[in-house]
From Swiss-Prot:
Keywords, ordered alphabetically: Cytoplasm, Lipid A biosynthesis, Lipid biosynthesis, Lipid metabolism, Lyase
Function, as annotated: Involved in unsaturated fatty acids biosynthesis. Catalyzes the dehydration of short chain beta-hydroxyacyl-ACPs and long chain saturated and unsaturated beta-hydroxyacyl-ACPs.
Organism: Nitrosospira multiformis (strain ATCC 25196 / NCIMB 11849 / C 71)
Domain of life assignment: Bacteria
One Gene Ontology CC term in the entry: membrane
Residue numbers annotated as active site: H47
Keyword GTP-binding carried by entry: no
EC identifiers of the protein: 4.2.1.59
Name of the protein described by the UniProt record: 3-hydroxyacyl-[acyl-carrier-protein] dehydratase FabZ
Signal peptide: none
Enzyme class, first EC level, given as a word: lyase
Length: 146
């Protein structure tokens, strides 16, 4: 899945779109995506000017976006103005190594279960085959409140 198809499913746009390409997709089971981390990312200006590191919360957000793609593409639900994909929980988040400019962040999301419209995933971010972060994420799609 290239960036054009990703934009059909995710409502995120620059500077908060954190998935560049989907490398593998198994409907209802798993998705592997890629984020190319460059020095041009706006967060590196302040985090940290003399030693740029991608904020851990943004690594988790990238994982949540990969999980969203897994759910939305599995359900064949494209982004629209009537619904929103909510990040509703995170458990067991761990950060194992910093993510720096020049890294290719591999984002892996695997469905653990789905119940009453709430999806739970095992999520892992890797750089060069080494774990950068991992967590269990919970997300849901709901109608947008007016």
């Amino acid at each position: 899945m290239d960036i054009h198809e990703i934009l059909k499913y995710l409502p995120h746009r620059y500077p908060l779109l954190l998935v560049d390409r989907v490398l593998a997709f198994e409907p209802g089971k798993s998705l592997t995506a890629l984020k190319n981390v460059t020095i041009n990312e706006p967060f590196f200006t302040g985090h940290f000017p003399h030693h740029p590191v991608m904020p851990g919360v943004l690594v988790i957000e990238a994982l949540a976006q990969a999980a969203a793609l897994l759910t939305l593409k599995t359900s064949n639900v494209e982004a629209d103005e009537n619904s929103i994909y909510y990040f509703v929980g995170i458990d067991n988040a761990r950060f194992k190594r910093p993510v720096e400019p020049g890294d290719q962040l591999i984002l892996k999301a695997t469905v653990l279960k789905e119940r009453i419209g709430i999806w739970k995933y095992a999520a892992r971010a890797e750089v060069d085959g080494r774990v950068a972060a991992e967590a269990e994420l919970m997300c849901t799609v709901r109608p947008k409140e007016t």
